[in-house]
Regions:
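Short surface loop/edge beta-strand patches of beta-sandwich-type extracellular domains
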Residues: 29-39, 88-108, 176-183
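Short, aromatic/His-centered strand-loop micro-motif at the edge of beta-sheets
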Residues: 164-192
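Extracytoplasmic low-complexity segments
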Residues: 2, 17, 21-90, 231, ...
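Flexible glycan-contacting loops in extracellular carbohydrate-active proteins
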Residues: 216-260
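Extracellular, beta-strand-rich glycan-interacting domains
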Residues: 45-52, 109-118, 252-284
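Acidic glycine-/aspartate-rich tracts in secreted/extracellular proteins
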Residues: 50-56, 117-120, 168, 199-202, ...
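Short tryptophan-centered beta-strand motifs in secreted/extracellular beta-sheet-rich domains
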Residues: 112, 188-197, 206
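Glycan-recognition/cleft segments
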Residues: 128-168, 224
Length: 285
């Protein structure tokens, strides 16, 4: 018995020593925030933008898989919590994919903090929409098959919000426009936005600062969103799905970028409940 105990202690020591050496040999990735989410959990993509490195790629690491963006030309600024990113005309942060979000999502939620000041502008500097995020698409026509994107358009008096989703079986505009445009959200103040699609009811709910907008948008019995992951060529934060040189030109609404600030960008493969949205807003993260 004594010999067995000695052998166990010796093996335990060697195991600890081995893993310690392996950890020391790994290159440091730097510190980045990790959200409370178990492996394989519903939070599939999360960027806090809280990095303080001189390397902009490290400042935009996805915390779910420690994935670096392919490009980040945007500058850091004070955020809703810690640091954020400042949008710029024609620029965006490029990621290979939103991880496995499209594969797993039947219901889904997109959440972020944003700040905008006055009239939204296109990339030519005239009135037009500004895109929070989009998927680059394998389709290169003048329309927008296989992409998904979110745009704001308007000023502080009234602003439209439009969330477009393209699935394997159809497409849908979830909109708050016309008589349902939203006042007071372009006043250069941070606000928390959550878009929660529930496959059970085919309904999209918009929350602003933890409060549900009374206008919901229904996708006529569509059910699970069913996005084709194989058609997503990149995830863009801060710009629409089209690029310079496309047929719609520099002022084109589908390539317009976000000119304000963005922070704490999350994508879930589940529909957050009202209580979960309220808790997320209250956390200020």
């Amino acid at each position: 018995m004594k010999n067995k105990r000695l052998l166990f202690i010796t093996l335990s020591f060697l195991t600890i020593a081995l893993f310690s050496c392996q950890k020391m040999e790994q290159p440091g990735l730097g510190d980045f925030p990790k959200d409370s989410n178990p492996p394989g959990g519903p939070l599939n993509f999360y960027v806090a933008f809280d990095g303080t490195s001189s390397d902009p790629l490290r400042n935009a690491v996805d915390s779910i898989r420690a994935s670096f963006p392919a490009d980040n030309p945007l500058t850091s600024t004070a955020g809703s919590s810690g640091q954020a990113i400042k949008g710029a005309s024609g620029k965006f942060i490029k990621y290979a994919k939103p991880n496995d979000w499209a594969v797993k999502a039947a219901s889904f939620t997109v959440a972020f903090w944003a700040k905008g000041n006055g009239q939204t502008l296109n990339n030519s500097g005239t009135n037009g929409p500004e895109a929070v995020f989009s998927f680059g698409s394998a389709h290169n026509a003048a329309d927008w098959p296989n992409t998904t994107f979110l745009i704001f358009e308007g000023d502080n008096t009234k602003c439209a919000i439009k969330f477009y989703v393209y699935s394997k079986t159809g497409d849908k505009w979830f909109t708050w426009e016309g008589a349902n445009m939203i006042a007071g959200i372009r006043d250069n103040q941070w606000r928390h936005y959550v878009f929660s699609y529930d496959a059970a009811t085919s309904t999209m709910t918009l929350y602003i600062n933890g409060v549900a907008n009374p206008i919901t948008s229904v996708w006529g019995g569509h059910g699970g969103v069913n996005i084709d992951d194989s058609k997503i060529t990149e995830l863009r934060i801060g710009r629409g799905p089209r690029t310079d040189g496309d047929a719609d030109g520099a002022g084109g609404w589908m390539q317009s970028s976000w000119k304000g600030e963005l922070d704490q960008f999350r994508m879930y493969s589940t529909a957050l409940t009202a209580a979960q949205v309220s808790a997320l807003y209250a956390s200020k993260l």
